[in-house]
Swiss-Prot record:
InterPro entries the UniProt entry points to: NA-bd_OB-fold, Rib_uL2_dom2, Ribosomal_uL2, Ribosomal_uL2_arc_euk, Ribosomal_uL2_C, Ribosomal_uL2_dom3, Ribosomal_uL2_RNA-bd_dom, Translation_prot_SH3-like_sf
Name assigned to this protein: Large ribosomal subunit protein uL2
Family as reported in the entry's similarity comment: Belongs to the universal ribosomal protein uL2 family.
The keyword 4Fe-4S is assigned to this record: no
Matching SUPFAM superfamilies: Nucleic acid-binding proteins, Translation proteins SH3-like domain
């Protein structure tokens, strides 16, 4: 009798394959888009900067003047006891949050909303920023880090600056174990052995005197879980000629 594949074990959802979400700090969203921000601004003080296992960038805890506490993505150069401001009348300063219509063209921005009040959707990874290309009364054009141009509502909010944690990819992992721990923190699947390198008891592509699948790698979408490996329900395989 063969062994269960890794996809079968992960699909069962045992603790070994679940995301350790109980260690995550909080959902990072802007405060509610209320009259304070639409008509003026609200100030807050950075009380702490912490690491969140759920994301690549550090997060800052902010206590606003109305007593509300929120976690925000920390921009570069922010420090504890710094003051930030959110709202239509906030100054153009790193860490402040304003509607796109109030931000000058060419300003680096991050944590951009897709629709007004959704809390932030784009440009949230460490070291990233977007550029505000142009805007008019009906739409604002933002260039994302990928080079894609995004046409957004001018009332969508964004933060001024660059997300902290830049240069993260420049530091090598050095050991496979370090990368394993990084993947484990987010519940990702770490690198595993290829099926053709396994024994026949471990994988449908295993066994034989040399490494080869030994059978067609295209399988039906209705195949049972133990056989659903390779090109699943593929319309075509190989190079397109």
């Amino acid at each position: 009798m063969g062994k269960r594949l890794i996809i079968q074990r992960r699909g069962r959802g045992t603790p070994a394959h679940r995301v350790a979400s109980h260690r995550f700090k909080d959902k990072i969203r802007y405060r509610s888009y209320d009259a304070l921000e639409k008509e003026g601004s609200i100030k807050g003080i950075v009380t702490d900067i912490v690491h969140d296992p759920a994301r690549t960038a550090p997060i800052a805890e902010v206590k606003f003047e109305n007593g509300e506490k929120k976690f925000i993505l920390a921009p570069e150069s922010i420090q504890i006891d710094d003051e930030i401001e959110c709202g239509i009348s906030a100054p153009i300063k790193f860490g402040n949050t304003l509607p796109l219509a109030e931000i000058p063209e060419g300003t680096p921005i991050y944590d951009i909303e897709n629709t007004p009040g959704d809390g932030g959707r784009f440009v949230r990874s460490s070291g990233t920023y977007a550029s505000l290309i142009t805007h008019d009364a009906n739409q604002s054009v933002v260039e994302l880090p990928s080079g894609e141009l995004k046409y957004l509502n001018p009332r969508c909010r964004a933060s001024i600056g660059v997300v902290a944690g830049g240069g993260r990819k420049e530091k090598p992992f050095l050991k496979a174990g370090n990368r394993w721990h990084a993947y484990k923190a987010k519940g990702k699947k770490f690198m595993t052995v290829r099926g053709v390198a396994m024994n026949a008891v471990d994988h449908p592509h295993g066994g034989g005197n040399r490494q080869h699948p030994g059978r067609p790698t295209t399988v039906s979408r209705h195949a049972p879980p133990g056989r659903k490996v390779g090109s699943i329900a593929a319309k075509r395989t190989g190079l397109k000629r």
